[in-house]
A protein has these predicted regions:
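Acidic, proline/glycine-rich intrinsically disordered inter-domain spacer in sigma factors
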Residues: 1-23
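Short, contiguous strand/loop micro-motifs
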Residues: 5-9, 30, 55
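DNA-recognition helix of helix-turn-helix
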Residues: 18, 29, 38, 43-44, ...
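ABC transporter NBD signature
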Residues: 26
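Intrinsically disordered, low-complexity basic tails/linkers immediately adjacent to helix-turn-helix/homeobox/MYB/SANT
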Residues: 78-79
Length: 79
C-alpha cells in the first residue's frame, strides 16, 4: 500500500477521534483546550480571556490532556 495514503487515512482517523473527544468536554474546557493547542494562545492570554487564574487554566489543560490520553488509549491508539 501507498505509505502516504496510509498516513492520510491515519490522520483522518485521529482527527475524527479528536472531534469525538472534544464533544465530550464542557464548553469551557473545550474552548480553553482549543485556544491553547489550536490557536496557540499563551496560558496568560487564556486566563485573561476566561477570567480565570493561570493555575486554574493549567489544571484544566492538564486534566483535559490526561482525559484525551485515556480516551485515545481506550480507542486503541498507541502513544
Amino acid at each position: 500500500p501507498d505509505v502516504s495514503r496510509e498516513q492520510q487515512l491515519q490522520s483522518q482517523e485521529l482527527g475524527a477521534l479528536l472531534n469525538d473527544f472534544l464533544a465530550t468536554l464542557s464548553d469551557e474546557n473545550r474552548r480553553i483546550f482549543m485556544r491553547r493547542y489550536w490557536y496557540g494562545e499563551s496560558i496568560g492570554e487564556i486566563a485573561q480571556r476566561f477570567r480565570l487564574g493561570e493555575s486554574n487554566v493549567k489544571t484544566k489543560l492538564m486534566r483535559t490532556r490526561n482525559a484525551l490520553r485515556a480516551f485515545l488509549e481506550k480507542e486503541g491508539v498507541k502513544p
